[in-house]
From Swiss-Prot:
Tissue specificity: Expressed by the skin glands.
Any one biological process term the GO annotation gives: defense response to bacterium
One Pfam short name: Bombinin
Family that this chain belongs to: Belongs to the bombinin family.
Name used for this protein in its record: Bombinin-like peptide 2
């Protein structure tokens, strides 16, 4: 349903954000 789609999108967005922050601080 819509709820699971939003949850899935949110999870992937958080993963992308965490990855971006990790790369930012690694440099």
């Amino acid at each position: 349903g819509i709820g699971s789609a939003i949850l899935s999108a949110g999870k992937s967005a958080l993963k992308g954000l965490a990855k971006g922050l990790a790369e930012h601080f690694a440099n």
